[in-house]
Amino acid sequence: MNAQQVLSQFQATGVQTCFHGRHINPQIYAGLDGTNWRLKDYEAREGYAALRKMLGIGGGEAMTPDQVVATVKESALRGRGGAGFPTGLKWSFMPKQYTGPKYVVCNSDEGEPGTCKDRDLLQFNPHMVIEGMIIAAYAMGTQVGYNYIHGEIFQTYQRFEEALEEARAAGYLGDNILGSGFGFQLHACHGWGAYICGEETALLESVEGKKGQPRFKPPFPASFGLYGKPTTVNNTETFAAVPWIIRNGGKAYVECGKPNNGGTKIYSMSGDVELPGNYEVPMGTPFGTLLELAGGVRKGRRLKAVIPGGSSSPVLPADLMMACTMDYDSIAKAGSMLGSGAVIVMDDTRCMVESLKRLSYFYMHESCGQCTPCREGTGWLWRVVDRIHNGHGKPSDLDLLDNVADNIQGRTICALGDAAAMPVRAMLKHFRHEFEAMIAEAQRKTLTPTLSQGERVSTEARSA
C-alpha cells in the first residue's frame, strides 16, 4: 500500500488515533485497535512466540545468549531513544564473567518535546515491550529489570502494571519462566516529570531514590549502573522491536529497512501538518512520503523548516529536509539528528525567533543545575532570544548567542547542554536573516525620534 492509498483509507474512515492504516509495513503497531492490548490479544498476534522460540519451547533448540546477541547485531537495530547506538553491540558490553546482580532497564521517560511514541506503545502494546525486555535479560544474563515511565502519564503506568500482572500470572515472568529454568523479575517505576531523567544515568539515580542528576562517565552503566552493578538501558521502542527480530531473524529485519538502519521506526509527526500522530514506516523512507502520510503541510501552505528528531535536534530548512530519507545516516549528513523520531513541521507562517525562544525556555527550565555552563548558559540563551523577540535586540546579540552556545556545547556532564546549544546554532545558521531583520526593526524604532506632545500640536497647527 502506497502513501496515497493509506491516506485515502484514513480519510474514508475518519479515524483520529494512531490505530490507522497510514503505517507502511508496520511491525510494532500492526493489528492494534486501541482495545486489544491484553495478553490474550497479544498472544493472538504471535505474542511471546519469540520468547518460546528462544527458550526452545514447542520444538527446536533453545538459543544461547550469545546467539540472541548475534541475531540482534545482525538486525542492525539501533537505539530508538535518540543516540542510535547499535543495540546488539550495546548488549555485548554486559560483562559475562560478572556473577553478581545485573540489571536491564527500559527508558520510558519520554520527555522530549514532540515525542509521543513510547506512551502509545506502553498504553496499547505493553506486552511487546515486556517480551523484548525478557529476551534482553536472557541475552545478557540479568535477573531483574525496571521500566522507568514518565511521571506525567500515570494512566500509562497503571496500564503497564496491569500487563505485568498478566505476564506473571501466565508464567512469562518469575523465577522459572515457562519451566525453562530461566528467571526474570520485571518492575514498573514512575518518575516525576523531570526531563533530565531521560538521561540514562540520571534515570538510574532516580530509580535508586536519589535526585535525578547525571553521573560522570566513565564508568558507564555497563560496568557501574543501577546500585553500582552492571546495567543496560534501552529505549521503549528498542525493546519493542526485539520480539520481531527473534521470530523472523536479523537478516529479515535489515531487509525491512536499509543497511546500517534496520527495520521500521515510529515517527511522531507534529506541528503544521494536517494529520499529526505516530507513523511507523521502514527506515530509509523518503521524508516526502512521511509528510504525505501526515496529510501534507496544513492548509496547503509552503514547507519552511523541519526539526527532524525532537526539540534537541538542529532544524533543517525545507530544501535540505525534502532531500533526506528518514534514517540516522541521511539526517546526519544533512546536519541534524534523527533523535527520537519526533518530526516537528513548520510552515511559512512560523517565526523562527519565536520558535527558538520557546525551545530555549524549555531547556532553561529543565536544566538540573549541576553543571555551570548549562545552568547559567541556558538562562543566557533564553534571555537574549527573548530580548530579540520582544524588540529590544542589538546587533551584537547574535555573536553573543554564538559565544554562549560555544561555552555550553561539549562542556557539560550530559547532553542537555548540547541539546540547548545546537538548536540555537542551527537557527542562526539557516535563518539568521530573520534574527537580523527583527534586530534591525528594533534599531530603527530606537533611532526614530519621537515628537513630544507640544511638538505634535505645533506641527498639526502649521499643517492646518
List each model region and its residues.
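Hydrophobic alpha-helical positions that pack around
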Residues: 157-283, 295
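Gly-rich Lys/Arg/Thr-decorated short loops/hinges at beta-loop-alpha junctions or inter-strand turns
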Residues: 34, 42-49, 106-118, 221-227, ...
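Short amphipathic, charge-patterned alpha-helical segments
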Residues: 132-136, 282-300
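Accessory "access/gating" subregions that flank catalytic or transport cores
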Residues: 54-97, 255, 260, 268, ...
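Histidine-anchored nucleotide/phosphate-binding helix
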Residues: 125-139
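Ferredoxin-type iron-sulfur electron-transfer modules in oxidoreductases and energy-metabolism complexes
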Residues: 1, 49-74, 100-104, 108, ...
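Conserved phosphate/anionic-ligand binding catalytic regions in large, soluble enzymes, centered on
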Residues: 47, 72-94, 136, 191-205, ...
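Cofactor-/ligand-binding subdomain signature composed of acidic, glycine-rich
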Residues: 2-69
